[in-house]
Curated annotation (Swiss-Prot):
SUPFAM superfamilies: Ribosome recycling factor, RRF
Protein name: Ribosome-recycling factor
Protein's gene: frr
Keyword Iron belongs to the record: no
Keyword Protein biosynthesis attached: yes
Example GO molecular function: ribosomal large subunit binding
Pfam families per UniProt: RRF
Taxonomy, superkingdom: Bacteria
NCBIfam families: frr (TIGR00496)
Organism this protein belongs to: Bacillus cereus (strain AH187)
Gene Ontology CC terms, in alphabetical order: cytoplasm
General function of this protein: Responsible for the release of ribosomes from messenger RNA at the termination of protein biosynthesis. May increase the efficiency of translation by recycling ribosomes from one round of translation to another.
Main location group: cytoplasm
Gene3D superfamilies xrefs: 3.30.1360.40, Ribosome-recycling factor (1.10.132.20)
Length: 185
């Protein structure tokens, strides 16, 4: 029973770190990256639709993103949605494709992005710690029910703590790499 709790906690911590990595992908660094548009929703025939489902997005150059809509009539809506998303990007529409040139980040904007990265990192750490707390609570319930001994409880609790430390270190490492990427000129 204790092994199941440990395995479940490990899987949940892994998912929390994976979610954090996906979240960081939407934070814009100095170069073009299609994932910055992941959260952009376009009002397409009255339904909010992710831009990635409406267009082919390519990165032909380091600082250029090209969006080629499958339906040419939606090009204006896609452009409006990108502007409305307030990503600090200025799309230019030539009637068939939308080009987004990524300007070089200012020092101030870089510092703001680092703050965002740190905020996301803290949220990910809280998620990992919540998984630890839930796992420890489950173990205590098992011990109260007599399914595991007090020594087993202590051992499993230590194992969960080791996993927690491992995943928090992973979050810190990912954050450090992203900060380095952002501060790179």
């Amino acid at each position: 029973m204790g092994q199941q709790v440990l395995k479940s906690a490990n899987e949940k911590m892994e998912k929390a770190v994976a979610a954090y990595s996906r979240e960081l992908a939407t934070v814009r660094a100095g170069r073009a990256n299609a994932s910055v548009l992941d959260k952009v929703q376009v009002d397409y025939y009255g339904a909010p639709t992710p831009v990635v489902q409406l267009a082919n997005i390519t990165v032909p150059e380091a600082r250029l993103l090209v969006i080629q809509p499958y339906d040419k009539t939606s090009i204006g809506d896609i452009e409006k949605a990108i502007l409305k998303a307030d990503l600090g990007l200025n799309p230019s529409n030539d009637g068939t494709v939308i080009r987004i040139a990524f300007p070089a980040l200012t020092e101030e904007r870089r510092r703001d992005l680092v703050k965002v990265v740190k905020k996301y990192a803290e949220e990910a750490k809280v998620a990992v710690r919540n998984v630890r707390r839930d796992g420890n609570d489950d173990l205590k319930k098992l011990e109260k029910a007599g399914e595991i001994t007090e020594d087993d409880l202590r051992g499993y609790t230590e194992d969960i703590q080791k996993e927690t430390d491992k995943y928090i270190a992973k979050v810190d490492e990912i954050a450090k790499n992203k900060e380095k990427e952002i501060m790179e000129v």
